[in-house]
Amino acid sequence: GNTRVYFEADMLYNRRLGKHDVDALFLYNQQAYDDGDIQDYRKQGVAGRLSYTYDNRYVAEFNFGYNGSENFAKGKRFGFFPSLAVGWLMSEEPWMQKYHNIFNKIKFRASVGKAGDDKIEGRRFAYLTTLNQSAQGYTWGTTGQVNYEGDVKGISEGDIGVSNLTWETVKKYNFGFELGLWNMIDFNLDLFREKRSNIFMKRSIIPSQSGFINNPWANFGKVTNGGVEMSL
């Protein structure tokens, strides 16, 4: 049957000093999943968060993840993924209080961060070369393949391992605006942009004399997109 083992340990810190709020978290996690395959699925990582708020008006938060994946060779398994966010709750400024019955919320926020993906479609351990155990057998004389209780199959290379594969990454940028009116209407606006790089793709043009049976994987894809989201 399937078995899953998950271990997590964390440390928390929270303190308020006058108008200052500080919150911190450090977390370690490790997981293994066995679905009856030859090799377990394993991941390991640490994460942290540090946030600061001043007088419920100014907010800053830093997050990070340092994650390891089984899908990459030693030296390429771990990736560092940080993010930073800041915010200003303008409606909490003293000079805005006389308008609070109209503008119950005015908030500006911005963030930048980096995330990673280790999933290679239909392939585990892409840094290892695979072997095909059902290749054409040896031929002797004029009798064809060796027969001993059936054909004796040969072994050939399948996918060639690529040792420098590493995490696919995406950098995210966001600017947001939140507006609340008369405690009845909420309006949100988000401008975002994403730059994805090191995308897992198979090389499409490989010379036949290279000897590759199948085109190898590589981190070379790039995609950039952005947009605007609004809600009312």
What is each of the regions a protein language model found here?
Residues 1-232:
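Extracellular/periplasmic, surface-exposed regions of secreted and cell-surface proteins
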